[in-house]
Amino acid sequence: MNVKGASASGKSTMRPLQKQLAARLGVNWEHFALISPDIWRKYLLDYASLGHARKYAGALTGAEVAVIDQKLDRYMSYKGKIDQLPHLLIDRFRFDSFAADEEDGSRLLTRFGSDVFMFFMITPPEATIERAWIRGERYGRYKSVDDLLAHNVEAYSGIPDLFFTWVLRQDKRVHFEFLDNGIAEGQRPRTVAFGLNERMNILDLTCLLDIDRYRNVNIEARTPEAIYASPSSRYVAKNPEFLKQCLRRIPTVIFAEHQTGHIYARIVNGKLTHWNRRIYQLAVRDDDTRAAFESIARPAQGESSISLDDNDRLDPHQSLTLGQWGGTSLMP
């Protein structure tokens, strides 16, 4: 299991849900090794001794954490070679971790993983700033605002490449899920999209488009309003790059209404093959989101339905998702 997202996006809060997923899979949670390099910071530096400088502890250990991270990759690679690698739960910010073009150690999942679960957190940058401050007050792990915003840019720039590296693989079972964590504390994140290998189901198109928006934020912002001061971060309707790549590179992409799972479009090899205008109008109410969708998959003028009726739907009981969707929640 590999969870990716910006700093303070809620990666660690997914662990209870991942534990329940392991139970559904019949895998003993105690057999998982947790890979979370940020925890090492507290072993590298005595936070209490820093006084007022404690808020800069993260930056003061950045180089050391990078060294330990690389050593861990090599160690896990060795464990894999001797067939002693445990199940892994990977909570890492690094977006080069386990990418296909990395050196030997970082290709660990490619070489030794059989079933891979990828979780991508989509959290508004302004929310990560607030949550990071609260986390710092509670646990002493502070990050500066510009560092957090830069992490958001790196995260949302890195998600597409890492996603496509895995979703198109033929030799592994790759489950993936994008989760909206811009929700109140204590609530379950919402499933934005999910799938298995070469099929993708999109439930919240507006939130998926935020991946493009969030990677273009103003890292020098000093107010929430200034975060989206750049035009490219505010208007992605004219150029929804990540959505375009999904439709171009993933053989089957299905669009469905979030609350019911009712399907309103199916695109196969880049062509719109199924369409239900009524469900589409219920599911997509935001004008910019409609503009983004119709710029890529515009149905024929006046076409109300192509081989789809109102009963075609995705079933949450047939998925291995962690988030809320389809009007049900399988793992409270």
How should each PLM-predicted stretch be described?
Residues 81-83, 161-175:
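A structural motif corresponding to the C-terminal end of an alpha-helix
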Residues 55, 113-159, 300, 307-313:
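A glycine- and Lys/Arg-enriched "phosphate-lid" helix/loop adjacent to the NTP-binding pocket
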Residues 49-52, 132-137, 192-196:
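Short secondary-structure boundary/capping segments
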Residues 2-23:
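Glycine-rich phosphate-binding P-loop
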